[in-house]
Amino acid sequence: MKTKIFKVKDIFTIVNPKGHLNTKQLIPGDDLPYVAAKKTNNGVAKMCSKDNIPTTDIMDGNAIVFIQQGDGSAGYTTYQPKPFYAISCVTCGYSPRLNDKRGLYLVSILDKNKVFYSHARSWNRQLIQETELPLPVSTVPSPDYALIDSMIIGGGYRNE
């Protein structure tokens, strides 16, 4: 399998969450996941109601969430398939080529960057954009998304 190094900024549009409500201000409910700086539970700190969240603060799903800081979670990523609420401890990456299979694959690659970040060094927007991703390529110099999909569906890559 041939790979090429891409930077996050070449694959994703990076978006900062717009949310300003803290955990205590959120109304408990089942409408939206509140995605925070944690790796466990796919980054979901709690479920909340949409009742006091402006619609402009709700992030679209089908996103890679980059955890910038947190209790040992800085440098991790999660894939969020559905709309969610988040605040400034994370940054979101969007791509029209992203789907659930590619999201899982990219999270597994991106999480290898965890070793570079901690309480002393957060994964800020600039560092996120410059983060390198080794991705499979075919004859054209862009990621081979069909191969990524088949690896996730088929459970791996076999060079026969």
Located regions from the model:
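A generic structural motif
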Residues: 95-98, 135-139
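Short, intrinsically disordered, mixed-charge
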Residues: 53, 108-115, 150-153
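Glycine-anchored helix-breaking recognition loops at helix->coil/strand junctions
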Residues: 89, 107-138
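A structural detector for beta-sheet-dominated domains
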Residues: 9, 67, 134-136
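Non-catalytic DNA-recognition/assembly elements of restriction-modification systems
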Residues: 1-42, 138-160
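Sequence-level motif detector for i,i+2 pairs with an aromatic at +2
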Residues: 3, 29-32, 61, 82, ...
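A short beta-sheet element
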Residues: 47-109
